[in-house]
Amino acid sequence: EKFLFYRGVGRFTLPIAATMDAAGQVSIRKQGPGRIDEIILFSNDRGRLRYEVRRAADGLVTVDPPVTDQEPSLELQRMLVANGLYPEEANAMVKTWRDSWLEEGTRLFYVVPRRVIDSVLPLDINPPADDVARVFVARTELVTPAATNEITRALLANDIPALAKYGRFLEAIGRRIVENASEADRMLLEQRLQSAYAAMMTFRDRCAG
């Protein structure tokens, strides 16, 4: 028996919106149908791991879990099983996405409510299956003030290695920095951002080749 997991690109409103302010508080707002029992707040800061399982609710949640140096793999698996996967499936899913889910950064995870999945991606099986479990994990990246400051410094210094660790998120964060920059810095930051992103794409293409 083998498992196949996939991800794709889509554009729709997620049931939870989250933002982080300068004080490190995460504002969580429920904005869609369906029930979400819990979320996992996770942070990887240069290998220092923090995470905490919280009940999903509107309001402010302070992102200051203790440094555990432990991965939330078991908590992720338990959350997947609670939403319909078999233990073997949950274990395989976490192993498949581990490097991406637990890379450096701050993010939250939760399982998208089934009714949201069915409305966005209707599924029709003929003949009908006895049972169907559809478990989609939502990952929301939180841009911390520390990350914004680090990227700003790296852009001004043209420090490509420091920028490269932000991977596919660099352009989105960088655009926000450019938009909020002073007139004096905006053009330089824009040029450095384009240069860094081009260098990263060239490196990726070489590795793929």
Task: Describe the residue ranges of each PLM region.
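Protease-labile, long low-complexity intrinsically disordered regions enriched in Pro/Ser/Thr
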Residues: 1-209
